[in-house]
Structure formats: structure tokens, C-alpha cells
From Swiss-Prot:
Keyword terms of this UniProt record: Isoprene biosynthesis, Manganese, Metal-binding, NADP, Oxidoreductase
UniProt protein name: 1-deoxy-D-xylulose 5-phosphate reductoisomerase
Broad EC category: oxidoreductase
Annotated GO MF terms: 1-deoxy-D-xylulose-5-phosphate reductoisomerase activity; manganese ion binding; NADPH binding
Record: residues binding Mn(2+): D153, E155, E232
Binding-site list for 1-deoxy-D-xylulose 5-phosphate: K128, S154, E155, S187, H210, S223, N228, K229, E232
Keyword match tRNA-binding: no
Gene label: dxr
Amino acid sequence: MTRFQRVAVLGSTGSIGDSTLDVIARHPDRLGVYALSAYSRMDKLAAQAAACGAAVVVVPDDAAAARFRAAWRGKAAMPEVRVGPRALAETAAAPECTTVMAAIVGAAGLPAALAAAQAGKRVLLANKEALVAAGSLFMAAVRENGAELLPIDSEHNAIFQCMPQGARAAAPTAPAPGVRRLLLTASGGPFRRQDPADLHEVTPAQACAHPNWSMGRKISVDSATMLNKGLEVIEAHWLFAMPSERIDVLIHPQSVVHSMVEYDDGSVLAQLGQPDMRTPIAYGLGFPERLASGVGLLDLTRWGRLDFEQPDLQRFPCLALSFAALRAGQPACVALNAANEVAVAAFLEGRLRYTWIARVIEAVLEWQAKQASVTLTSLDDVLDLDARARSFAGNLGLA
């Protein structure tokens, strides 16, 4: 049996955080909560901390700390309240913590995820930006500090499970022997069948209505545009040392097959399961053993059929832009992610039309390509380029 794990759940009030706490609560003999963090929902954070007995909570500023203290209704002593990004990174690296669930959405989660890797933690990676914006830095930190890296995105977790047993290295430097290509599946989101000409009038509520998964608003929009899948292609490149030409995307509307690995002999291994994030979370927490997740049985007779099709890049230009960014290099991936975060925020606030999300990304990628050559050798380099890309996106007049 693996050692008892004390988990820091970064981004605990989101959907991944909820699912993580659900799995942890099912295994009190093996798992406990060391720390929680949240950005805005202090009432929920207080309730979570009281329920799981967290020793530490991390909030963004003093105002949030005051709201947390006012919301505290726990019978036990209030947890230590830490404030700010530096406290978040220090908590992720704390010696009392063995495992970090990196589930903060966006580039804001990057420093803490990197700190966890540098401290040699088991990192359950649900934050895409750690690899999209800083893949080389992050993977080097994993290798150099003996960290364990377990992907939590359902697609990458599926690929991880389908890889050769001896090839599940924490940070490979070359593709696994015998693996021909990776096949990432995508539901196609709510607009899979919609005429591209009609997408101009899409509302935030429509874009957030994912047909299969329960997710936060930002990632739901990313799923609708398939930018989310593009980010996952970039992640797969770093996680499995796989070149872009050996990574393919398939639309699979049922979301039962979570991804596949094709081998040189023609064999294809697929991981199937319910569209429930507790499955990959339990896998990451229990690895190399299996933990009960609370997910029900998969009844394939209920589905009757499983469909697959090629993505329409006219309907999903963000996917094509993501492949282009990966081929262009790490600075382009930083710009891609920054532009998307700015554009999606503007869309959700009603300041940007849905179809202009891709336009903003394309404009920022064109801007980045014209910049002087950039070498990203530190987190500060990444964050500087991220800030400049966000500034350019925000000044386009579209956002």
C-alpha cells in the first residue's frame, strides 16, 4: 500500500476541486487534506475547509482573507490563512504536503505548479498552462527534482494508462518505443453540428452548455471552440515527448473513449469510462494502485454505438491555430494561451462575439511571430511574454 498522502488542492472551489475532495473523503485511511486555495468563493472555501479539516487555506488578498474569516462556521479551529501568490507557491512546496492537485485555471496557476515540481512533489496536473506556456521549464523541473507527474485531464490520463508499462516515466525525453501516434478524442462541444455562419450570434450561456461534462465557464468555452483540445495537443507533446505530426484529434461525441494510443504493430489501446473526472483523479491519487472513485458502472449497451469523425477546422479554427503554435515553438504557445484567456474573458463579459475569439488569437500569434527572438529560460521570461501578449490582445479593439 502506498504511503498516506496529505494533499494540497489548489483551486478547490472549482469542479476539479470538488471532485478531488469527493475522492479524498472516500479514503480517510490513505488520503487527507493539507491545504485548499480559492480565488473568490470564500463561503464555499470555508465550508470545504471545515468539512475536510484543512490545516491551511490560501486566498488572493487581504480582502478575501477577511471574507473567509467572516464566513468560517467550523467547530474546529480555523485553518491558517495565507495570502497571495507567493504564499500559494510556498504552500505547494511545503514539507507537510506530499501531493499537489494543480487545478487553478489559467496562467495564475503556473508558479504554484512549478514550485510543486521543484519541491519533488507528486503533481496531479489539471492546469494546462503549466505545460502550454512553460512546457520545457516544467518538465525539466520534474526530471531534475524527482517529482511524480500524473496528468489529470481525462485525455492525457487515458493516454498515460495506455502507454507501455515501462514508458510511464515522469518526464520522458523521447517517444515511448513502439508507439506510432496518440489519438486525442473530443466531444465536439455544443456546436459540433451548427453551421459556422450561425456561430456569430452564440451567447455565453450557449457556449457553456457542454453536452457531456460538468465544467467551469472558461473551460466550457474552450471546449466549445476546441481551443481546449488544441491546448491538450500541446500538453500531449510535452507529457509524452511526441512530435505534433504524431498527435491526431478525433471527434467522439459520446465521450466514452477518452483517448487512444496506436502502436507500430497496428494495435490501438483505448481507455473507456464514464465522463466523470473522479476517475482520472482517483487514478492519480492512487497510482500505481487503483482507488474506488465513486463512479458508476459503464453500460456500453446503453450507448449502442460509438461515433468518430474528423474535426471541421472551418468550424473550429482555434484547433488549427493551436497546432500552428506548437509547430512555431514555445513563445507562440505562450501567446496562444494569453490571447485566448483575454478573448474568452471578454466573451463571457459580453464584450466580444464568439467568433472573434479565434480572430484575437490569430492576431496575437501574428504579433508574436514579428517579435525579436525570445528564449524562455525562466518563469519570469514566460510571465513577461504572457503579460505582453495579454496587453496586445487587450488593445486590439476586439477585446
